[in-house]
Swiss-Prot record:
Cited Pfam families: Stress-antifung
PROSITE patterns, sorted: GNK2
Organism expressing this protein natively: Arabidopsis thaliana (Mouse-ear cress)
Keyword Repressor in record: no
InterPro entries: CRR_secretory_protein, GNK2, GNK2_sf
Cellular component terms (Gene Ontology): extracellular region
Record's protein name: Putative cysteine-rich repeat secretory protein 17
Gene: CRRSP17
Record flagged with keyword Signal: yes
Residue ranges of domain Gnk2-homologous in the record: 39-142, 148-265
Keywords: Repeat, Secreted, Signal
Chief location category: secreted
Length: 278
């Protein structure tokens, strides 16, 4: 016979196990998206020189850092500020990934700023890439201009295996569609603009079990035409990096980036526009 006490303890244990199982499922769900914010790369703009401690340039930079940190523009995933003039001009551009805005964007800005200042100490210019944002500091105002000089590619060492030709055809289908979304569909999170989001994401079946996931994005200071030009140029420029059928690759620069993997890495529900599925 079971006592009332033992039954009660058993029910409590079951409840605790259920809570643990729920938490594990939530952790698994988040990790399955691979929503990391890893450091990817950086470049110091050595030619722009360094600033001195306590200089007008440093004060301008500190003022911008504070304004972006406490401002509301990060809620949309993008911010651009400039301060000063001549040799003391400071321009800062922050672009967060389309599904990373608000607190995630603010957190990525803090990580990127700390990382750039550590890797490029007192340089007037530099750029750094994380999974969920890019940050550029410069003494030259190049906002709205295409920049291919800082582009690079990172690819998976492994190939997809059989039939890379079929893989590339499906890659083309996926990226044609998400690029179209990026340059035609407005940002649903912004009510006061009709400008397209310059971000697109989606997935394409590779068979009965596998899927390919892709994402394209341009910085918000670009025009639609410039965004399209940037994506096409980088896809062609780095085709040897991914067109052999790599299991994943990404191309990044100051103006635009794209990525694909065989696992989900963006949040389809928090993107600024529709999510492509095929």
């Amino acid at each position: 016979m079971y006592s009332l006490s033992s039954v009660s303890k058993h029910l409590i244990l079951v409840h605790i196990l259920a809570l643990v199982a729920t938490q594990l499922l939530l952790i698994r769900s988040v990790s399955s998206l691979n929503m990391t914010n890893s450091y990817l790369n950086h470049k110091c703009f050595v030619s722009q020189g360094k600033y001195k401690p306590g200089s007008a340039h440093e004060k301008s930079l500190e003022a911008i850092i504070h304004s972006i940190s406490v401002g509301e523009n990060v809620n949309s995933g993008y911010d651009m500020m400039s301060f000063g003039d001549g040799p003391d001009l400071v321009c800062v551009v922050l672009q967060c990934r389309g599904d990373s805005y608000g607190s995630k964007c603010r957190s990525c800005f803090a990580s990127a700023m700390a990382g750039l200042r550590r890797r490029c100490p007192r340089y007037k210019g530099g750029i750094i890439w994380f999974d969920q944002c890019l940050l550029e500091i410069s003494s030259i105002d190049n906002v709205g201009q295409l920049n291919y000089g800082d582009s690079f590619c990172m690819s998976n060492a492994k190939n997809v295996g059989d039939d890379p030709f079929s893989f590339i055809l499906k890659w083309d289908t996926l990226f044609d569609n998400i690029s179209r979304i990026a340059i035609t569909e407005k940002n649903k999170n912004l009510k006061d603009t009709n400008k397209p989001a310059l971000y697109g994401a989606g997935e394409k079946r590779l068979g009965t079990k596998k899927k390919m996931y892709g994402m394209v994005q341009c910085t918000d200071d670009l025009s639609v035409k410039a965004c399209e030009e940037c994506l096409v140029a980088n896809i062609l420029k780095f085709q040897n990096c991914w067109k052999s059928g790599k299991r994943g690759a990404r191309v990044l620069d100051r103006s635009c980036n794209f990525r694909y993997e065989l696992y989900p890495f963006v949040n389809a529900k928090t993107g600024p526009n529709s999510y492509f599925k095929s």
